[in-house]
Amino acid sequence: MKILVAVKRVVDYAVKIRVKPDKTGVETQNVKMSMNPFCEIALEEALRIKEAGFAKEVIAVSIGPSQCVDTLRTGLAMGADRGIHVETNSIFLPLTIAKILKSLADVENPGLIFLGKQAIDDDCNQTGQMVAALLGWPQATFASKVVLDKDKNVATVDREVDGGLETLNVDLPAVITTDLRLNQPRYASLPNIMKAKSKPIKKMTVQDLKVDIKSDIEILEVTEPPKRKSGVMVSSVDELIDKLKNEAHVV
């Protein structure tokens, strides 16, 4: 069985986000970029499944500019067998990304597709669900535990929901999106970083995959959240009640 893992290049989580002066997006020039943390978890889970003998190959896929090769090399250093880079300088919304992944799945015929539940740059939480719908495959989102039954060709997935956990059985092939509690991603060792340089990365274009990139959604503007007034320290409960009553008028 092959496992296809989508990995996204995003602004590093430790970087303070700045909006471009023209408000067309966030500034990505001269800032640290890294693999989306949820994608790292997805890749780690795929690697563990392979190491347990349930899969023969893990393929990392990234869609974006030429710099996405660095993200793929990180994935290869973690243990992925090969990479696919769909190169584009356009910024695609989730449905277009899902169409591209669907086309790649048609070519690669994986038994599982793993994605992070969302990317930390846009927080859309849509791509995995859309990929499953386009393929007509079952899906399990927000996975916090994944157990495969090779004989029954079924994945049992614990998923986090409001107020608890839900357990699903999904027939393979399936799409699974990963939550934070699923695992702790490994660090790439120096020998594996060196080995990753010789692992293959196949370059493709949207045109190669014959994907319709037309979108019915247009991003009009990206703005920073409004600045909030700083909080006020009070010295006693009586003073707090007084301010809530006479200044905030909430009691």
From Swiss-Prot:
Function as written in the Swiss-Prot or TrEMBL entry: The electron transfer flavoprotein serves as a specific electron acceptor for several dehydrogenases, including five acyl-CoA dehydrogenases, glutaryl-CoA and sarcosine dehydrogenase. It transfers the electrons to the main mitochondrial respiratory chain via ETF-ubiquinone oxidoreductase (ETF dehydrogenase). Involved in leucine catabolism and in phytol degradation.
Required cofactor names: FAD; AMP
One Pfam family in the UniProt entry: ETF
Induction: Expressed constitutively. Not induced by dark treatment or sucrose starvation.
Keywords assigned by UniProt, alphabetized: Electron transport, FAD, Flavoprotein, Mitochondrion, Transit peptide, Transport
SUPFAM superfamilies for this protein: Adenine nucleotide alpha hydrolases-like (SSF52402)
Designated name of the protein: Electron transfer flavoprotein subunit beta, mitochondrial
Alphabetical GO biological process terms: chlorophyll catabolic process; L-leucine catabolic process
Family: Belongs to the ETF beta-subunit/FixA family.
Compartments, as annotated in UniProt: Mitochondrion matrix
Binding note for cofactor: Binds 1 FAD per dimer. Binds 1 AMP per subunit.
InterPro entries with a match to the protein in the record: ET-Flavoprotein_bsu_CS (IPR000049), ETF_a/b_N (IPR014730), ETF_b (IPR012255), ETF_beta_N (IPR033948), Rossmann-like_a/b/a_fold (IPR014729)
MF term (GO), any: electron transfer activity
Subunit structure: Heterodimer of an alpha and a beta subunit.
